[in-house]
UniProtKB/Swiss-Prot annotation:
Belongs to the UDP-glycosyltransferase family. This is UDP-glycosyltransferase 86A2. The keyword Coiled coil does not apply. Keywords: Glycosyltransferase, Transferase. It comes from Arabidopsis thaliana. PROSITE patterns: UDPGT (PS00375). One of its GO terms (molecular function) is UDP-glucosyltransferase activity. UDP-alpha-D-glucose binds at residues 297, 355-357, 372-380, 394-397. It comes from the Eukaryota.
């Protein structure tokens, strides 16, 4: 049963648009959706934001609160909040049982969403726009059933979207879906420079494409071809040719970076884990002397790799803050770090379960970021001008590494061969990064990122305006208005 919190009367704003936002229920998707909700509400659009019961329970620690209550009372923005079942009990271990969770999202979640949408459409001020995560397989079907404008929000790079969008071309050319895939360059995707197959998303490199995640990707990218608009958390200056090529197929708007680069989202809690505040510890360290380490909210690291990285950190002798999620190896692996690691590190480092990443990255003592290369992390580290040490684990992270190291030159690889690396290589590359490699170039890339949102007539603000104009036109037509 859906739970809808609707504490404010609808004051529309001048747009008469009411958008339902539905993120894929993972931390890295919820975060940009929250920031998008505030961005749209700031334009006068009424927003109803949907979390699953599980995500809501994790964020609120089991309370019955509305995560937007604070920002709504401070700003007056018309953001409502609803929760819906993902088809599994709240207490089910989604990290340990990843495939079961994804299967529920593929086969069961749709029915709960449809029930919620049915309760929110119709009448004056009802929902008339649905903005759903691209990884859902049903948005165009639900939108068509209820007469909604359908928008897909892609929370990753446009390059990754384009490679998935053109899976048919990859199949035809033998670069995907074959027992023996080709290893030569992929040079036929519109708007995409020649790319090595090893730099495509991990799911595009696998020969067995029968997994539940592959089923989701296949169906989602069939569905996205039927939506009205696509929003993308990137900027025009980063991926201009790719975006222009996609625009010949579907209205595709780069409106990034959608990250918490100011305090407007400070009152919205989005973290699935309790955050540790390490500001006081960071205050004791010299400028640019601390390596921040985090492998994100979703992917797992093998115990073997984690041990080598830990010893490499000790060998490097650098100061560090290391986020070690409780389930970083597995939910049933309670102590993944080598015995005596924290004792040997002493005051040089702290290990924490989770933190506010932007708070750490923006601290002047932080001079490097060892990351899994999740897209949110890449945008945030560019914004904070912190060079990157790349250790991609899966999915789009592999392609993001290419952008960071090969194209933009704002970081280096932790290791050259992820299947065979050791602590000595880790220690050497940590020291290379902390000696200032890539610092100058990341400053230039930051200027592009900042320019996309801060300057008058900037690309992302202009694209957002074009998107809203498109929504008004679609809603006006469907409502019989001029």
């Amino acid at each position: 049963m859906a739970d809808v919190r609707n504490p404010t009367k609808n004051h529309h704003g001048h747009h008469h648009l009411h958008a339902l936002l539905i993120p894929y229920p993972f931390q890295g998707h919820v975060n940009p959706f929250v920031h998008l909700a505030i961005k749209l509400a700031s334009q006068g659009i009424t927003v109803t934001f949907v979390n699953t019961h599980y995500i809501h329970h994790q964020i609120t620690n089991g309370s019955d609160g509305d995560i937007f209550a604070g920002v709504r009372s401070e700003s007056g923005l018309d953001i409502r909040y609803a929760t819906v079942s993902d088809g599994l009990p709240v207490g089910f271990d989604r990290s340990l049982n990843h495939d079961t969770y994804q299967s529920s999202l593929l086969h069961v979640f749709y029915a709960h969403v449809e029930e919620l949408v049915a309760s929110l459409v119709g009448g004056d001020g009802g929902v008339n726009v649905m903005i759903a995560d691209t990884f859902f397989v049903w948005p165009s079907v639900v939108a068509r059933k209820f007469g909604l404008v359908c928008v897909s929000f892609w929370t990753e790079a446009a390059l990754v979207f384009s490679l998935y969008y053109h899976m048919d071309l990859l199949r035809i050319h033998g670069h995907f879906g074959a027992q023996e895939t080709r290893s030569d360059l992929i040079d036929y995707i519109p708007g995409v420079a020649a790319i090595n197959p090893k730099d495509t998303a991990s799911y595009l490199q696998e020969t067995d494409t029968s997994s539940v995640v592959h089923q989701i990707i296949f169906k989602a990218f069939e569905d996205v071809k039927k939506v009205d608009f696509v929003l993308c958390n990137t900027i025009q200056q980063f991926e201009d040719k790719t975006i222009k090529a996609l625009n010949t197929k579907i209205p595709f708007y780069a409106i990034g970076p959608i990250i918490p680069f100011n305090n407007q989202t400070g009152s919205v809690t989005t973290s699935l884990w309790s955050e540790s505040d390490c500001t006081q510890w960071l205050n004791t360290k010299p400028k640019s002397s601390v390596l921040y380490i985090s492998f994100g909210s979703y992917a797992h690291v093998t115990k073997k790799d984690l041990v080598e990285i830990a010893h490499g950190i000790l060998l490097s002798k650098v100061n560090f803050v290391w986020v070690v999620r409780p389930d970083i190896v597995s939910s049933d692996e309670t102590n993944p770090l080598p015995e005596g690691f924290e004792t040997e590190a002493g005051d040089r480092g702290i290990v924490i379960p989770w933190c506010c990443q932007m708070t750490v990255l923006s601290h002047e003592s932080v001079g490097g970021f060892l990351t899994h290369c999740g897209w949110n992390s890449i945008l945030e580290t560019i914004w904070c001008e912190v060079p990157v040490l790349c250790f991609p684990l899966l999915t789009d992270q592999v392609t993001n590494r290419k952008l960071v190291v090969d194209d933009w030159e704002i970081g280096i690889n932790l290791c050259e061969d992820k299947s065979d690396f050791g602590r000595d290589e880790v220690g050497r590359n940590i020291n290379r990064l902390m000696c200032g490699v890539s610092k100058e170039k990341i400053g230039r890339v930051k200027m592009s990122l900042e320019g996309a949102v801060r300057n008058s007539g900037s690309s992302s603000e202009m694209n957002l305006g074009l998107f809203i104009d498109g929504l008004l036109s679609k809603v006006g037509l469907s409502n019989g208005k001029a």
